[in-house]
Amino acid sequence: MQIFSNKSQKLTILKEKPFKLEKEIQSLFEHNLDIIDNLIFVKSEFKIKDYRIDTLAYDTEVNAFVIIEYKRERNFSVIDQGVTYLNLMLDYQADFIVEYNESCQANLKRNQIDWSQSKIIFVSPAFTDYQKQSTNFKDLAIELWEIKRFDNDLISINPIKRSKSAPSIKQVQHTKDSALDKVTKELVVYDEDYHLNDKSDDVLELYESFKNAILTLSPELEITPKKLYVAFKQGKNNIVSIHLQNKSLKIWINAKKGNLDDPKKLTKDVSNVGHWATGDYELTVSDTKNLEYIMSLVKQVLQS
């Protein structure tokens, strides 16, 4: 992908400035985890047994740990290292909790963590076709992110998307009780089908109507299924989230209390009530009668 600078309608190609050291990438990420992916930085060079994790982070949206590894070279196995580190996390959960509490001066409890949503991210200027193919499974908790640096201090960070036809890792033969077997049993990568299964045709049709309406609001919106809801994100931020119920949809709009103009009073203030997704505004819908109006509420968040 080429990056251009635009000055007075004249485009100039910005040259890539390769990172000389992995530490440069690591430092950039660790100082900007909240901006890059809404993560909390926990520890750099976290030692566990005979291993050293480059960056340990925590995702407060899903209450799970995230391991981040940085690679400048391309001659390594993302599957082998990824599975090893994820298995390490599952085997030594207490060590991860202690490190979080000591580093973040917190009091995180074991039952507050959803270990099933743990994952590892590999960050590199480039990945080989083999590396991309070896992680192209819809339910594998290993992600590849490409990072590049250009002139004028421009940085691009692009998570590599799995193909829509990506198979399940469970279809791949592997030894029972192996590290890969344990990881695939205990970690879950949620997809849209997980939320659509066993729902009535009426609810599925209702969801499709709202989903399509939301996606037409901006080409930047992407669907990101979580354990309890389907999030529609713009970059790293949730804009709106949907939970499919038996006969209706529960919708959360990601705006702080007082920041949403809702003259029809369709939404409910949940700022002081426990709820699943992000945002202080919640509503339940069982038809498309107010679809256009609800989209006007979502649009306020997009334009804020």
Q: Where do the protein language model's features map onto the residues?
A:
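Charged, terminal alpha-helix-loop-beta segments
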Residues: M1-S218, E222-S248, K256-G258, K268-V270, ...
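Short, surface-exposed loop/helix-turn segments at secondary-structure junctions
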Residues: N254, P263-L266
